[in-house]
Amino acid sequence: MSGQTETLSSTSNIPIAKAEPEQSADFSASHKKRGPVSDRSSRRTSSEEVDLMPNVDDEVDGDVKPKKIGRKNSDQEPSSKRKAQNRAAQRAFRKRKEDHLKALETQVVTLKELHSSTTLENDQLRQKVRQLEEELRILKDGSFTFEMSLPHRNPSLSSLPTTGFSSNFAHMKDGISPQSNLHLSPNSIEKPNMHQNVLHNDRSADNLNHRYQVPPTLVDSNSAQGTLSPETPSSSDSPSNLYLNYPKRKSITHLHHDCSALSNGENGEDVADGKQFCQKLSTACGSIACSMLTKTTPHRASVDILSNLHESTVSPPMADESVQRSSEVSKSIPNVELSLNVNQQFVSPFGGTDSFPLPTDTGLDSLFEPDSAIENSHLKNVVMEPELFQAWREPAESLDKEFFNDEGEIDDVFHNYFHNSNENGDLITNSLHGLDFLENANESFPEQMYPFIKHNKDYISNHPDEVPPDGLPQKGKHDTSSQMPSENEIVPAKERAYLSCPKVWSKIINHPRFESFDIDDLCSKLKNKAKCSSSGVLLDERDVEAALNQFN
C-alpha cells in the first residue's frame, strides 16, 4: 500500500506532457485577445499591475463606466449655446434702438412746439415795440408835462386826474393799433363828465374862482396844463361836495409849493430832478414826502380842520341851510392850540341860551365825543360829514416842542445852574468859574440837600492863602493870571448854518460841474449826515460844501 501511495505522489508532481499543447493554445488565443500575459508563477512589477488594471475592470464589469467630475451638459439646452446668446443680444439691441427712436421723436415734437410758441411771442413783442414807438412819437409831438402827485394824497377825495397826461394815457395803456388814425393834442383831451355840470351852470369862471378862493396864478397854470391844484374843487354843485372841496388845509398846498419851488429859474427837468432828490433825501427821516412839516403847519393834526375853519374869515357857499348850520357848529368849536381853558363857556350858535363847558379831559379825543349837554333838537337838521375826520392828515409835530428847538436838538434845560460850566471838565473842579459857583452855592442849592458845597465854601473862606483842594485855582490879591468874568456872562455856542432840501438842491445845480455829478451817490452821502427837525430834513452847510468839493 505504501508503495502505491509513493508512486501516486510522484506521478502527481510530474507534469503531464499531453496538457501542454492545450495550454499553449489557450495562451495564443489570450495573446491575440488581451495582449501578452506573463507567466503566473513569475512576479509582477507595480507598473505592470497598473497597466493591467483596466483589463481587470473589464473582466469584472465590462458595461459600467465611472462618471466624470464637473458640470454636466443638459439635454434641454440647444446644441450651439453661442448662437442662442447672439440671438438674445440682438433682441436687446433692437429694443434699445426702438426706445431711443421714440425718445428722439418726442423731443423733436416738443422742440417744434417750443419754436412755434417762441416765434409767436417774438412777433407779439415786435408788435408791442412798434406800438410803443408810435406812442412815444405821438407823446413827443404833444406838449405833455409830467408832474408828480401830491405826497400821501387820498385818491378817494377827488376823482379828477392830476395831469392831462394821466387822463390821456388811460386810453393808450392797451396799445394803439396801426390801423387807427389817432392824433393827440393838448386841445383834444376830453374833460371828465364832472366838468359838464359847471359848463351848464350860469356862474362864470371868475365867480367860481373867487368863490373858492383860488389864486389867479394857480388858475392860469392849471388851465394851461390841464391840471388841478389841491384847492381846486371837484366842480360838483352838491352841498356835500362843496363842503368837502373847501380848502380846509393850507399845509397840502404849502407842501406842493415847497416841492415845486426848489429853486428859482430852473427848467422843468431840474425841478423834477429836485423833487426826486428831496424825496430820496427825506427817507433819512423815515418819510417819502417831498418836504417835511414846516413851521406854518398845524402842530396837532386832530384839530387841523377845525382850526382852519375857525381862522378862515370867508365861509364856503352853502346850497342848503342844513350844511350852513353844520359849518357854524364847526366854527363854534374853539382853537385848542390857542386856549384850553376848562372854565370857558360857549353860547349855542343857534341863538339859544344853552351853554356847555369845555370837556375837562385833557386829551384831544374828548373834543370829538358827543356831549350830553347839547340838546338833540339843535342837531336834528345838521348833516354830519364822516369824511371830515376819516381823511388822511399829516403827522403832528412833537407836543414837547418847547423842549426841542427847530433843529431837533435839546435846549439847555439846566441853563439856570450850569451856564458857567466848562464843556471839557467837571463842573466844580475844572471850571474856570468854580470859586464864583461855590460862593453862590447857597442861592442855587439848599444847604440841606448839598452840604458838601457848604463845607468847601468854609474851607476856602478860612484858608485864603492855601491852594484849594482838587486843583481849584487860588483866589487872592496876588492872583492876576486869570481874570474872572462876571457871573451873568454867557459864552454862546458856535452857530451852524443848516440848509433845507430846496436850498441844498439849489447849491447843487449852481455848481459849475453839475453835469458830471452822480446825484444818487451824492444823495446817499448827504443822507448819512442829514438831521431831522420839525421843518424837514436839514443839512449842515459845511457838510454840503465838503461833499461838493469832492467833485472839484
Curated annotation (Swiss-Prot):
Motif segment (Nuclear localization signal): 81-88
Gene Ontology terms, MF aspect: DNA binding, bending; DNA-binding transcription activator activity, RNA polymerase II-specific; RNA polymerase II cis-regulatory region sequence-specific DNA binding; transcription cis-regulatory region binding
Alphabetical list of SUPFAM superfamilies matching this protein: Leucine zipper domain (SSF57959), YAP1 redox domain (SSF111430)
Keywords of the record: Activator, Cytoplasm, Disulfide bond, DNA-binding, Nucleus, Transcription, Transcription regulation
Coiled coil: none
Domain bZIP, chain residue ranges per copy: 76-139
Biased composition (Polar residues): 1-14, 219-228
Region Basic motif: start-end pairs: 81-102
Bias kind Low complexity: ranges: 229-240
Effect of C285S: Constitutively cytoplasmic
Region described as Leucine-zipper: 104-111
Residue ranges, annotated region (n-CRD): 259-290
Residue pairs linked by disulfide bridges in the UniProt entry: C278-C501, C285-C532
Effect listed in the UniProt record for changing I519A: Weakens nuclear export. Impairs nuclear export
GO biological process, one term: positive regulation of transcription by RNA polymerase II
Positions of the UniProt region annotated as c-CRD: 501-532
InterPro entries: AP-1-like, bZIP, bZIP_sf, TF_PAP1, Yap1_redox_dom_sf
GO cellular component: chromatin; cytoplasm; cytosol; nucleus; RNA polymerase II transcription regulator complex
Post-translational modification: Depending on the oxidative stress inducing agent, pap1 can undergo two distinct conformational changes, both masking the nuclear export signal, thus abolishing nuclear export by crm1/exportin 1. The glutathione-depleting agent diethylmaleate (DEM) leads to the non-reversible modification of at least 2 cysteine residues in the c-CRD. Peroxide stress induces the formation of a tpx1-dependent interdomain disulfide bond between Cys-278 and Cys-501.
Spans annotated as Disordered: 1-99, 213-244, 460-489
Assembly behavior: Homodimer. The reduced form of pap1 interacts in the nucleus with the nuclear export protein crm1, and in the cytoplasm with the peroxiredoxin tpx1.
Domain notes: Contains two cysteine rich domains (CRD), referred to as the N- and C-terminal CRD's, n-CRD (Cys-259, Cys-278, Cys-285 and Cys-290) and c-CRD (Cys-501, Cys-523 and Cys-532), respectively. Cys-259 and Cys-290 are not conserved in orthologs in other yeast species. A nuclear export signal is embedded in the c-CRD, with which the nuclear export protein crm1/exportin 1 interacts only in the absence of disulfide bonds (or otherwise oxidized cysteines) within the c-CRD or between the c-CRD and the n-CRD.
Main function: Transcription activator involved in multidrug resistance, oxidative stress response, and redox homeostasis. Regulates the transcription of genes encoding antioxidant enzymes like catalase ctt1 and components of the cellular thiol-reducing pathways, including the thioredoxin system (trx2, trr1), ABC transporters involved in multidrug resistance like bfr1/hba2 and pmd1 as well as the gene obr1/apt1. Preferentially binds to promoters with the core binding site 5'-TTA[CG]TAA-3'.
Listed name of the protein: AP-1-like transcription factor
